Design a protein with these regions (language model features):
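Conserved phosphate-donor/acceptor-positioning beta-strand/loop module used by diverse small-molecule
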Residues: 123-142
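Conserved GTP-binding G-domain of TRAFAC-class P-loop NTPases and closely related GTPase folds
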Residues: 21, 25, 30, 38, ...
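Short glycine-/polar-rich loops that comprise or flank the Walker A/P-loop
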Residues: 19, 97, 123-128, 174-179
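Glycine-rich phosphate-binding loop used to anchor ATP phosphates in small-molecule kinases
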Residues: 78-127
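Phosphate-binding P-loop
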Residues: 12-19, 94-96
């Protein structure tokens, strides 16, 4: 497992084997969607996964936009469950269909990582993690900027899980992943491309 530390000024391209599942994860508001928008030209109003250069780009906003008109009457926890289930199903379908996938995920729940790793193995490929590591204050500011704020108790749980996840990654102790790259905001800003032509 490779762990690339944050603040690496030369880290401009990330390269993975063809057909890999790359999961971009971080705290809510960390800037995951912003990074995908910049790298793949997403507008933010898509309702389905986007094909870009032979890669399926899957952001949870796509599932949220797909369901939006029908979810308004439902309570927030149920809306979140429906969107998350749809998002995970789309990731699994694309990976099992043999596509290279870059997917957005909050990913702080271990069972999600193990589940995605299992799906990748079924497809004969690997799970690779890109951790966008920002402090909670920056993530909270990102939530305010996008107009969707996670409730304080839930966000605190995210933060606890996130700290544990990053600590495990830096220690090389994330067995479900074939590789792990940790980026802070400046390093993410230098990233030019995520490629699927390595070995």
């Amino acid at each position: 497992m490779a762990v690339t530390p944050a603040c690496t000024p030369s880290l401009e391209d990330l390269t993975y084997p063809p057909g890999s599942l790359v999961v971009l994860t971080g705290l809510p508001g960390a800037g995951k969607s912003t990074l995908l928008d910049r790298l793949y030209g997403l507008r933010g109003d898509e309702t389905r996964p986007v094909s870009a250069g032979g890669v399926r780009v899957i952001d949870s906003r796509q599932s949220r936009s797909w369901w939006a008109p029908r979810l308004d009457p439902l309570p927030a926890p149920l809306r979140t469950l429906v969107v998350h289930a749809t998002h995970m199903a789309r990731i699994c379908r694309a990976v099992l269909g043999g596509h290279a996938v870059i997917a957005h995920s909050r990913g702080t729940w271990p069972h999600i990582l193990y589940g995605l790793a299992a799906v990748a193995r079924l497809a004969g490929t690997g799970l690779h993690l890109v951790l966008l590591d920002v402090d909670p204050e920056a993530a909270r500011a990102g939530q305010l900027a996008r107009g969707r704020v996670v409730a304080a108790p839930l966000f605190a749980r995210h933060c606890r899980r996130w700290r544990a996840l990053v600590a495990r990654a830096r220690a090389g102790a994330l067995p479900p992943a074939a590789s792990v790259t940790v980026l802070d905001r400046p390093a993410a800003g230098l990233l030019r491309a995520i490629r699927f032509d390595g070995r």
